[in-house]
Amino acid sequence: FYILEYGKLFDELIEVVKEKIANGVEVFMLIDEIGTLNRLPKNFLTDMKNIGVKCQKFQGLTSGLLHNNRDHRKIAVVDGDVAFLGGVNLADEYVGKKQKYGIWKDGGVRIEGEVARDFAKSFCAMFSLSSKNIRCPKIDEDKCEKIVGDGLAKSLFFTPSCVGEKTKAECEIIGLIDEAKTEIKISTPYFIPDDDIQEALQRACDRGVRVKIFVPGIADKKLVNLVTKSYYQCQLERGIEIFEFEKGFIHSKNILIDDSSILVGTINIDYRSFFRNFECGVIVKNSRASRQLADDFSELEKSCKKIEPKDLPKTRLLIKILRFFAPIL
């Protein structure tokens, strides 16, 4: 997990973990040291060790790695057969037990079977990278693309790369956008698209696809929110519709294509997710999950304000300044 903080959610989780450890279950935990900075006590790793959790911090401040590359993934895998992933971290605001920014809108997906093992393998690889002394159990190699339930699922894992290069994350998202025939819906807490994403959205609009972007109405990071708003005008001019969630903060990272194909994961539409972070996601096509996400977007739109030209920022100089800093936020 990228963020972990003591609170009601973690207390409930750790009680279950203690019970499972007592029954002989091995528990491994990997947290990002930057994401958890100032959220956990210094003796957290010792506390976890004392209850039997094998816990490591990813790319700590004392490591020789460039700590600006963060492990932004949120994954929980059970027995290598069930995986949970999405936007939810292990902190109370993510499940509505603490309201810092109004209503917290988040989401994720549960997957079972062979695709879940891909996430188990990914976790073990990152855990081994962070720990010289502890190794995860070996996971059998499997193909990435599998039948899950009533649809087709594909696991996605993204690593940092150089700004200016088209990344795997971008290629997957652009591929979905280019497949769209009728409608694209995207929810993201931060909308700071680079040229490749903007060009893909432009192509979609040019062929008559309706594009809707859902972003927070209440910001958790004011500067990043201002940068997001700086992209409103050019998107509206393309014919893209932008909706702000008036009741609070959208943290879900979902893409829905033609009410059929979905991408759910940890990937924001911004430079950090595309170029700086380790991220993950899953593409699911023609499944019950697609229909559930379509219903969720419909409900979300009812709680949103549609952005009109009169709502756009007026200061062009401010927009230019904010855009300059977009790649490093």
Regions found by a protein language model. Give the residues of each.
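Charged, low-complexity intrinsically disordered terminal segments
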Residues: 1-329
